[in-house]
Amino acid sequence: MSARETKRLQTRERLLGAATAEFKRTGMAQADVGAIVAAAGVAHGTFFFHFPTKEHVLLELEKREEDRMAKHFGRYLDKGHDLESALTEAVRLVLGLERRLGELLFKDFLALHFSQTRPASEGGSDHSLVLLLGQRIEQAQAAGEVDPEVRPINSAVFFLLGIYALAITTNDPMRCELLEDLVKRTMHSMAVIA
């Protein structure tokens, strides 16, 4: 890698860090690009060179967070945990993301995640957490633990959508119980019908 490329990547990282901090503080819509570039120590136009819009910052953050969660989830699955434990771990990972991002940024993150007007991401997005959970459901299906008519990837999507919805719409006293029930109901919905 050339010195120029190294410097470009370092600048992008500084901008991403400064933007993430500003988004946590104010939310994406209210974030001030001037404050972001001042914190990163770069010219105003440099932000738009690296990130054409503030939404592009969230896309980069989304990719990194999904990759991080998928790596952790993959290591967890490699230890041979059962399906119910895997679903519970997925809940834990999403709630951990909320703690790391903070309430404002987490809501922006999910709003962009499901937005029909979201910008196209550069490398595409394979939603690796969904794929890993779908594969785990498929393994349970092959072992006779999940109904043969269940579509594993659809069940993974439905489950994760449920987590996201409950995470942004419920408060702490109710949330734990609702998420535990989501795991139970998901297991019940996939059970082999005798």
Predicted segments, located by residue:
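Basic, helix-initiating cap at the start of DNA-binding domains
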Residues: 1-26, 30-39, 56
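C-terminal peripheral helix-coil segments that are non-catalytic and often amphipathic
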Residues: 2, 89-96, 130-131, 135-143, ...
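Hydrophobic/aromatic residues within well-ordered alpha-helical segments
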Residues: 11, 65, 69, 87-90, ...
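Short hydrophobic/aromatic patch on the recognition helix
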Residues: 41-51
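Alpha-helical DNA-contacting segments of helix-turn-helix folds
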Residues: 51, 58-65
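Hydrophobic alpha-helical connector segments
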Residues: 60, 74-101, 159
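All-alpha amphipathic helical-bundle segments outside canonical DNA-binding/catalytic cores
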Residues: 85, 121-126, 142-158, 174-178
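Short secondary-structure transition hinges
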Residues: 95-134, 168
